[in-house]
From Swiss-Prot:
Transmembrane segments: 28-48, 65-85, 113-133, 135-155, 200-220, 246-266
The organism's place on the tree of life at top rank: Archaea
Annotated keywords: Cell membrane, Membrane, Transmembrane, Transmembrane helix
Official protein name in the record: Uncharacterized protein MJ1189
Length: 283
């Protein structure tokens, strides 16, 4: 096995290996982020208007509903773009295992869409598998709340299992995603093989990658958070602020653009570990 620094350095340089392909991904991600932000803002305005019409001046329900319908179509477009991006991440992982050292092409969009959709479905199924037991414990606890001690015990055990299952899912799904990129949909569920690949080095790598991604995203978001707190919020006279809306959209665009690069970085680092670990286990 190579040192963890190798995976991190390689993943960093890999992200910058083809500027044009990276920009394409960043712009697609930004488009999806902008549409999603606008949809969320319109939905929020509609809810605020229904609760307190005085907070949204000059708009009636017809205008808001029309805007929501248009935004919903936009949301579907954003969802499709999201599947394409997920398909590209799958291609990044697959080509990494195949020893390619540059960002893959954006060709065969239909294939990216298909692989991205299956990637999404696979992750949902994994979430259900890992979360079903703790959720059932919590539900039983709620139904047994009339028996205070029994209900509280079930709920407590449920939340404890939920915490453990969440950690287990986060550890498992990184390698499962790479396995899917190599072997197809069934690769998500090769539990024995994937758990064999997990060791302390992998967990440390996962933590480091996670911290790097979180820090980068926080640094990108921080100027917009400070702007909203110190410049926009004190000047607001209503719940809805056009200035804050513009800041939210710009923040979503920039965060999504950077998010594409951090996602590629993370997928590359984990795929490199997967490749080396598979070779090591074969010996």
């Amino acid at each position: 096995m190579k040192k963890l620094e190798y995976y991190l350095k390689d993943a960093f340089y890999y992200v910058l290996s083809d500027v044009k392909k990276g920009i394409v991904g960043g712009l697609l991600s930004s488009t999806s982020g902008a549409i999603g932000a606008i949809f969320g803002i319109i939905l929020s305005i509609l809810l605020i208007h229904n609760i307190n019409p005085n907070d949204v001046v000059g708009l009636d329900n017809n205008i808001l509903l029309t805007s929501l319908i248009v935004a919903s179509f936009g949301f579907l477009i954003a969802l499709i773009i999201g599947f394409i991006l997920d398909g590209y991440y799958v291609r990044v992982m697959k080509t990494t295992v195949e020893n390619y050292d540059v960002l893959p092409d954006w060709d065969d969009i239909a294939e990216l869409l298909k692989r991205g959709f299956l990637y999404w479905i696979g992750n949902i199924i994994l979430s259900i598998i890992f979360m079903i037991v703790p959720i059932l414990f919590i539900i039983f606890g709620v139904f047994l709340i009339f028996l205070p001690l029994v209900g509280i015990v079930f709920i407590g055990i449920g939340f404890l299992l939920l915490f453990v299952s969440t950690i287990a899912l986060l550890i498992y799904e990184g390698l499962a995603e790479v396995n899917y990129s190599v072997k197809g949909f069934s690769g998500f569920f090769e539990f024995k093989e994937i758990f064999r690949m997990i060791n302390l080095n992998y967990i440390i790598l996962l933590i480091i990658v996670g911290v790097i991604v979180i820090v980068i995203n926080f640094v990108v978001q921080l100027p917009f958070i400070l702007l909203k707190i110190f410049a926009i919020s004190p000047a607001r006279y209503s719940t809805f602020s056009s200035s804050e809306t513009i800041v939210d959209v710009i923040s979503a665009v920039i965060s999504a653009f950077v998010g594409f690069y951090t996602a590629v970085f993370a997928k590359r680092a984990i795929a490199l570990y997967y490749k080396d670990r598979v070779e090591e286990l074969k010996k």
